[in-house]
Amino acid sequence: MSRLRPYRAGDAWLVSLRSEQAGDRMSFYDTAEGPAMTFERQGVVIACAGLARVWEGRYLAWALFSDLAPREWVRVRQAMHRVIGDTAGRIEATAAFPAAERFLEGLGFEKEGVMRSYHNGRDHALYAQVKS
C-alpha cells in the first residue's frame, strides 16, 4: 500500500527514476516555493510531484516517477488535481516521453508546442493550463 505525505528536502534524490527521466533531477526541487508531495510504498519513495512558484501567477509543475510508480499514477494525478485546483494563474510543465504527456493531459494541461533540445539535448513538449 502506498502513502502520500508532504515533500521533504532530499526526497527527489530518493526516487529510482524511470529510464525516460534519467538525468532529470535538478537541485531546484529542494528549494522551490510551492506545494509538493511524496509517495511512498513500503517506506520506499516511488514518486515526488509538486508546483514550483516562478513568480506571482506563474508556476512550474514537476513530477519524478520510479519504474514502480505507474501503478500509482492515478493516485498521484488525483493529488495533483487537488494542488492545481487551488492554484490560480499559469501552470507550465514539460514532458519528454509519452507517459508524461498522457499524465499531463489527464490533469487538464494543453500542449502548446515542442521545445527542441530543451534539457539534456532532448526535445520536450510544453504543456500549460491557465486559470483565473
Predicted features and spans:
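Acidic/histidine-enriched, beta-strand-rich ligand/metal-binding domains
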Residues: 26-29, 62-63, 75-82
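A conserved beta-strand-loop-helix scaffold within acyl/acetyltransferase catalytic domains
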Residues: 32-33, 49-57, 112-116
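Conserved beta-strand in the GNAT
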Residues: 38, 43-53, 59-60
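C-terminal "cap" of GNAT-fold acetyltransferases
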Residues: 61, 118-132
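Conserved acetyl-CoA-binding loop-helix of GNAT-fold acetyltransferases
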Residues: 70-86, 102, 106
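Conserved beta-strand-loop-alpha-helix junction that forms the acyl-donor binding cleft
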Residues: 87, 91-105, 110, 118-119
